């Protein structure tokens, strides 16, 4: 799998922000077909960091209603990457600009 196609974007929530500060864990939305090895390789090459571990899970899309019509948001794969002590990703560290 092409490394540029593995990571779709960052996933930033309050809970994941606390995990980043306390445990050096960063979260990404990744391609559903990507394996843990693909995610680790992509993060290491794109951000120049050392990955210690990768946890993945598939988040089921929620059912949403607008009036009478019912729709469903798509499922997506979430990857939580743990980095080596001292490494960080600047994409997550930036403040308000």
Swiss-Prot record:
GO terms for cellular component: ribonucleoprotein complex; ribosome. This is Large ribosomal subunit protein uL23. It comes from the Bacteria. Belongs to the universal ribosomal protein uL23 family. One of the early assembly proteins it binds 23S rRNA. One of the proteins that surrounds the polypeptide exit tunnel on the outside of the ribosome. Forms the main docking site for trigger factor binding to the ribosome. It comes from Myxococcus xanthus (strain DK1622). The gene is rplW. One of its GO terms (biological process) is translation. GO terms for molecular function: rRNA binding; structural constituent of ribosome. InterPro entries: Nucleotide-bd_a/b_plait_sf, Ribosomal_uL23-like, Ribosomal_uL23/eL15/eS24_sf, Ribosomal_uL23_CS.
């Amino acid at each position: 799998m092409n490394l540029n196609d593995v990571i779709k974007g960052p996933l930033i929530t309050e809970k994941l922000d606390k995990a980043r500060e306390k445990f050096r864990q960063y979260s990404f939305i990744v391609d559903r077909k990507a394996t843990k090895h693909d995610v680790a390789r992509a993060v290491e090459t794109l951000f120049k960091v050392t990955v210690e571990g990768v946890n993945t899970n598939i988040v089921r899309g929620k059912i949403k209603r607008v009036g009478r019509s019912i729709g469903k948001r798509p499922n997506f794969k979430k990857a939580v990457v743990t980095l080596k002590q001292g490494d960080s990703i600047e994409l997550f560290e930036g403040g308000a600009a």
